[in-house]
Amino acid sequence: MILQNLHCHTTFDDGNNTAEEMVLAAEAAGLRSIGVSLHCPIDGEDWCASSESEPRFIDEMRRLREKYAGRIEVWCGLEYDLRSARRSVPPYDYVIGSCHYLGGFAVDYDQETAEALIASFGGPIAAAEAYYEQMARLAAYGEISIVGHFDLLTKYDERKPLYPTASAAYRDAAFAAMERLHAAGKIFEINTGAISRGYRTTPYPDPALLRHLKSLGGRICICSDAHAADAIVCGFDEAEALAKSCGFDELWQFDGQDFAPVPF
């Protein structure tokens, strides 16, 4: 049973519920610890936290940690994005690194934007190569512990295949980024967020990518990327089954100081 979730969002950014409601949902779902993550401020983007709301988020997470001590452990996380002007992060408990933008386009906004992104690069392979090169840049950020939704660019592929994910060129680009991130000690999340929001029936990353990660000796955690309290553990059974089918027998969980392996 999965007992921790380190990726969820609240009304401090683009979530539907308060931080306290997410903590209570996690407790009700049987989790022993919950990490609430904040989309880092990005100038001009209203789905992220603002520079003014960020300190209030940190204060609220401290309050919730104290209030629910002895019931559920509460961690304060940041989802960092490469588009942020920030080059360092305040003292969060942990940091997730993600890439939501490429070449001026939002990677995951909608299918029309995804298709326009591909067209702007002249085709899906060039777009994928650029995306994974961006992802690989996260390796240089020592504060980042977790790689968020590694193949987010495939969000709409179940509806209409946009990327040739089985091709050698696509996998070479993805594998190269994965290898750089793994070499830097990053943990990869299996992310079920697109399941709860109805875009996919399977988690990120693709099984072929997870099998490659396993061959490298890579580490994983399972997160819901929930934006609503009723999705706090959405898809966890599917994610665990996927991890096991790709050869993983343990998750890496945050203990307040560092990450440690926990067998399934």
Name these PLM-found stretches:
Residues S37, S98, F150, N191, ...:
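Conserved residues at the C-terminal ends of beta-strands
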Residues M1-T10, A19, G104, K160-F264:
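Charged catalytic cores and adjacent phosphate/nucleic-acid-binding surfaces used
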Residues I34-V36, V95, V147, F188, ...:
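Hydrophobic residues within beta-strands of alpha/beta enzymes
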Residues C40, Y101, L153, A194, ...:
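Flexible, active-site-proximal loop/turn residues at the rims of small-molecule/cofactor binding pockets
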Residues C48-A183:
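Extended substrate/RNA-proximal surfaces in nucleic-acid metabolism proteins
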Residues E27, A139-A140, K214, K244:
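Non-catalytic positions within long, well-ordered alpha-helices that form the structural scaffold/packing
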Residues M1-L82, R87-V89, D93, T154-Y156, ...:
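An N-terminally biased module of ancient metal coordination in phosphate/nucleic-acid-related enzymes
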